[in-house]
Structures are given as C-alpha cells and as structure tokens.
Amino acid sequence: DYTLYQSGLFSTYAYLPYFDSKEMPVRAIAVSKDEKLIGSRNGLFYIDEKKQRFKSFKVPELRSNMILCIYAFEGKYYIGTYGGGIYILNPSTLTLSDFETADLKSTPFLKGHVFCIKSDDEGSLWMATSMGLYCYRDGKQIRHYTTENSKLPGENVYDICFDSTRKGWICTENGLCIWDPSTNSLKSDMFPEGFIHKDKIRTVYEDSNHELYFLPDKGAIFISDLSMNHFRRMQSGTPLDGKDAMFIIEDHEGWLWIGTNLGLYRYDKKGNFIPYNFVDGLPSSIFITCFPVIDEEGTMWFGNSKGMIYLTSEQNGRKAKWHYPVAITDVLVNGKQSVYAKMS
C-alpha cells in the first residue's frame, strides 16, 4: 500500500461546513478583501467569511448552471452564463436580477451565451456574447457590433482585452479585430502579414513590459509588442510544447503563470519553466479557461477542473525544500514476487 506525498504548496479552497470546492470544475472567480464568488458548471457560490455569509445559486433560480464569467462593477457582480444570459448579484442583499435593457428578449441577455464582461477606462461596460459585442454606459446600450454592421469576424465573441493604449482586442470564433478608441470603431485591417489575427484566440494578456500574449485555441503562445512591429511564437522545446494554454497572469516578481490542459507552469520569460503537479498540491493537472486573481495580500487564486486552488504570497513560486528519495521495497509481477525481489 502507498500514499502519494503532497507538499501542500497549493491548497483547495473550502468554507466548511457550507462549501467545499473539491472536485468542482471552476470556470470563473472573483475575489475581494472579504468576498469570494465562484462560478462552476454546477452553479454560483457566494462566500463572505468575515460576516459568515454563504449562498448558492442554481437552477431553477438560475436559467443555466454553467457560469462563464464574473465581473465586479460599481458595487455589484455581473455574471455571464452559458444559455442563461446575464445576472446581476447585489452582495448586500444576496439577490439576483436580470440585466435591464430595452428589447431584452431580442438580446442574448436572457437565453444566450455571455462569455466575457469587462469595463473600459471611460466606465463603459462591454459584453462578449453569442450575438456579437455589446457596449453599455449608464445602463443604456451605445453600441452593438455584429458581423453584418461592422468588421467583427464572428458572431461568437469570447473575450475583449483592453491594453495600456486603450485599444480593445476582440477575440471571436473566426479571429481577431481591434476596437480603436480614436475612431470609436472596430478594425480588421490593422494586422501585419504573419500575425495571428485569423486564428481562434482564447484571450490576450499584457504584461508589465507591455508585451501582449495571445493564447490560441490550438498551438503555441504568440507574443507581440503593442504596435505589432515585432512579434513571434513562443520558442519550441519547452514544457508547453503540445499543450493548450488556458490562461496567463504575471505575479509580483515578474514571472508568468501559465495554466494549460495538462499542467501549470511558472515562466521567467527567459526560457526557465517551473512545473507544478500533484506533489505540489494540485488536485488535477487539467486547467480550464478561468482567469486567475491575485488578491490584496498577494495570494493567487486559480480555477481548476477539480476545485478553486490558492497559493499564498509566502509560498509563491517556491517548491518544497524537502526532497524524499524513492526507495524500492518490493517488486511484484502479475501479483507474484519477482526473481529480482527474491535475490535482494
């Protein structure tokens, strides 16, 4: 008999006896000083440990149990679902409401898919949906981009990422386009030859060096400067080869954390990778598309296919110091002691 050793570097979040994320596929998280909001394929969960409040939301209270995104905006949480549109959670009353807008039934906000919700620096709220890209300000729709009325490459919009120059990178099922704030329009003719704009991109991330990381649905990560004058694929021959990147985030030491469909890695941008696995406390090597959060105390929170896991700032990026040698005590072949074992 044996027990696999785990260092406890990562921990799986629980708020017992009310909630345990163990074995839960976590797709969206929001973490503030006191509140945690966790979205999964099994509904939505709100936790406030300081005030000892907990509430779960599932069908039939929700139109869909599959939560795709959570975004904190003006004191409330906006929740995007797969097939159930948008909900707004008021954390003071722990009540849900629909997103109020004119012609609600003709939008995806009741029964459509809402993949991403973000705000820009002007306070506008953008929604990436199965019916194009929406923009709202002060509760009123000011834009709705579709493939018919704009340069949007596809109706299914998966993500929108605003960079430090205020440009918005729009990720669709058929490739990229750019929201140009100087002209208030979408553009698809700004990309140089050899760029990744025709691929299906999961998300775009800007690091502290103002480099953009494009995570394609399949293939190697693509890296570019903001002006798209210099770009490249991530070098081959790394632990990421053959894996699909699901998310990327930079920590306080300037390293990148990259979650894939087969493992979690910390990368120093110079060719050095640190892999993490079951021994480090990961419940599963399979990560799904869930953008991580770094809270005020420096703790990192990740969505995993088997729970919401976290890494405190004291443990950030460090492997356990203790190494345990493997010792073979017996060898069995088809349930019987082998000749080697008898000789030893």
Segments the model singles out, each with a brief description of its role:
Residues E35-I38, K76-I79, S124-M127, K167-I170, ...:
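Conserved beta-propeller blade signature
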Residues D1-T3, N42-F45, Y82-I86, M131-Y134, ...:
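Loop/turn residues immediately N-terminal
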Residues V31-D34, A72-G75, S119-E122, F162-R166, ...:
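Residue-level detector of Asp-centered blade-edge/turn motifs that repeat once per structural unit
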